[in-house]
């Protein structure tokens, strides 16, 4: 099972970050905007058996999204969140669905670090992915095995690639995630490449985030005195 090494970074000023990407020569990947809508559903046993062992089983549905349109400022409702982006138009048919299983590496399991699967400054886990063509029946299979979808979260992801240079032999992917709790960037690859990319983007190791979106969402809810449910955009942002 291949390793996944990654970090997250909080983007405080999305417009300034886009200017940095442009200065670095980053280009969209996959479409004119490199942008997709992701609808994620995490499965677990009723007692949270997978989570207890640092494991994750996720079904992701990706739908192509057009570039967001500039809109006038709107008044925020009590339920709306500060970081909600204007909703890009989505096609009605998913572009792809991916089933992902993640777990601690053998070294982490031996070191009893499954709950916080990271080495040093980077998050490291075993990861395996498979493309799905019949998600409805897959969900029925999971339910038949006693599993259920217990946390759903969505985001808009824009993927950009830095050009191949002496620094990046084959370029480097930068994934920008617009979520209901803010905008983040994910960097995945060899640790040295991640560190170089983070530096180019104006960050240092003290800015690295190693937790997942579920943990970030739960912390956001605690900070606001809200009960965690699903991390979803309000209808007006879809």
List each model region and its residues.
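Short phosphate-engaging motifs
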Residues: 16, 193-194
């Amino acid at each position: 099972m291949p390793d996944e090494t990654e970090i997250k970074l909080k983007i405080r000023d999305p417009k300034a970050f886009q200017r940095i990407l442009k200065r670095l020569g980053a280009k969209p990947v996959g479409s004119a905007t490199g942008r997709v809508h992701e609808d994620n559903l995490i499965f677990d046993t009723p007692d949270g058996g997978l989570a207890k062992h640092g494991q994750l089983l996720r079904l992701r549905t990706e739908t192509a999204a057009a570039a967001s349109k500039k809109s006038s400022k709107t008044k925020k409702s009590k339920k709306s969140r500060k970081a909600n982006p204007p909703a890009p138009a989505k096609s009605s048919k998913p572009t792809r669905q991916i089933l992902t299983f993640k777990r601690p590496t053998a070294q982490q399991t031996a070191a009893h670090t499954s709950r916080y699967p990271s080495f040093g400054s980077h998050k490291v886990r075993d990861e395996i992915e498979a493309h799905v063509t019949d998600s409805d029946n897959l969900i029925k299979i999971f339910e038949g095995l006693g599993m259920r979808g217990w946390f759903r979260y969505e985001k808009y992801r824009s993927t950009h690639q830095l050009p191949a240079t002496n620094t990046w032999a084959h370029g480097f992917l930068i994934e920008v995630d617009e979520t209901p709790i803010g905008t983040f960037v994910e960097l995945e690859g060899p640790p040295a490449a991640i560190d170089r990319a983070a530096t180019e983007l104006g960050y240092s190791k003290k800015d690295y985030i190693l937790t997942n979106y579920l943990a970030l969402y739960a912390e956001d809810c605690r900070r606001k005195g809200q009960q965690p449910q699903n991390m979803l955009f309000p209808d007006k942002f879809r």
